[in-house]
Structures are given as structure tokens and as C-alpha cells.
């Protein structure tokens, strides 16, 4: 089956993951007000539109060099750009203050001339992207089509009606990139845990935490899924934050993660979480299965 791959890219908190979730009518991708919650390029289910099988790739948002995951995110963006056919740039209408930074990022995209380009302005709380800034983006990005839509009041039919007006071309230079599958069970488990780390710990902890599934087993008689997880952080002080006083924080994280996963798995779930310090660099997620 030939698939057209659409990479969704843009500044942090522009609405990239929100858009893809709405297109799929689900919440497979994490949405948060925290910057750079998407650290890896994630592939979603096939959607049949415009007589094509379309897959949307959630790409990490542009980030500055001072960010702790700058190298990882930059690598993921480059990987995604080499493995897509269409580049969908999402910018929130109130992100006028990010225009200079965005301009430098768009200039680096000029080498990917073979990609079809679409520009989506997320009309946010009745605030407008200035005409000057819009012109800068149009000049630097040179999209085939511009879509202006409010993701808080998303009109899927309107989106597709405009999207279909674009001449969607396959990228003959596209590489066969093995993106993470949003429907992979291990991904759902790891992403579910990281979402709760973000909610409870905030600040820098979610960006430096690395998560691993150590063991996973299913008891058919009890209809019970047992999951043993490890959270690794570089410093003892960070470990103490995640565990919390009298282990209250890690208990809350575990309970919330289990509750989240019960929506994805048709069985009871037992979760055991161990927190350790690990100074060497680890992958964001370590899977049992690919």
C-alpha cells in the first residue's frame, strides 16, 4: 500500500499534536502546555482522503540551543524531513513573538525543495498573526496552500476541503524511516507514564527523565497486565523529586498512569515503577518490542 507521509512541524505549543488527534478522533498523542513535550517523531494511523492513503507524522517542535534536548530534537526533525512527502507547518496566531526564531528555522528548510508545503495558522483566542509576520513566513516557507482554522473549534470537513486543493506529490527522494507507531502498546505505556511525570513534576524533570519497560506479562486467567517500569534521571536530587515525600509523588504518578492505560487496554493493570539515577545518556524510551 503506497502511503503519503505528512510531517507536521512548527514552533512548540502551536497545536501540532492537537491537530493530529482531531483528525483521528482520539487522544493518542500527548497534548500539554509545556514546551517540547513531543521529543520523538511519531507516526499515526492511515487516513484515506483525496484518493490517497495519508499518514501524519507528529514531529518535535523547533527548539533553541539552550534546551536540554536540543540535540535530540534537532536530530528527530532532520530524520522526519528525510522521510516525508508533505511538510505541514503549524503556527499559532498569537506566536508573533517567535517570528525571528521561526524565520531562522524556515531558512534551514530551504534544502528540502522536493517537499509539498502547506501552512496552517491555528487561530487562537481571536488573536491574529500580524500581516507582516505572515508575509515573512510565506516568503521563507513558500507554501502551496495556506489554511486558517481554529483548532479549539476544529472543523474537520473544512480542513479536508482545503487540504484536498493541494497537489499532493510523493517525494521521490523520501527515505524509508522507521517512525515510532503511536498505536504500539509499549509506546502507549511509556507515553502514558511520561504524561503523568509532566503533569506532576513539571519544570525540567520531564525533559531529562528517561523511561524503560523492564518487564511486561499478561495473565489470561486473571485478565491482568503486569508492567514493570524504570524512570532514570541524572541526579539524586531529581530522583527525590519524582519519588516525593513518603513516596507520595511516585504513587500519584503510578495511579494516574494506570488510570490512563485502562482506557487503552481491555484488562486490569498492575504497574510497578522504580526510579534510579543514571548519568550516561539513554534513549527517551526503551521498548520491549519495536
From Swiss-Prot:
The protein's superkingdom reads Bacteria
Q: How does it sit in the membrane?
A: Peripheral membrane protein
Q: Where does GTP bind?
A: 10-17, 58-62, 122-125
Keyword Transport among UniProt keywords: no
**Quaternary state and interactors:** Monomer.
Tell me, in a sentence or two, what this protein's role is. An essential GTPase that binds both GDP and GTP, with rapid nucleotide exchange. Plays a role in 16S rRNA processing and 30S ribosomal subunit biogenesis and possibly also in cell cycle regulation and energy metabolism.
User: Cross-referenced HAMAP family, in alphabetical order?
Assistant: GTPase_Era
State what protein this is by name. GTPase Era
Q: Give the species.
A: Mycoplasma genitalium (strain ATCC 33530 / DSM 19775 / NCTC 10195 / G37) (Mycoplasmoides genitalium)
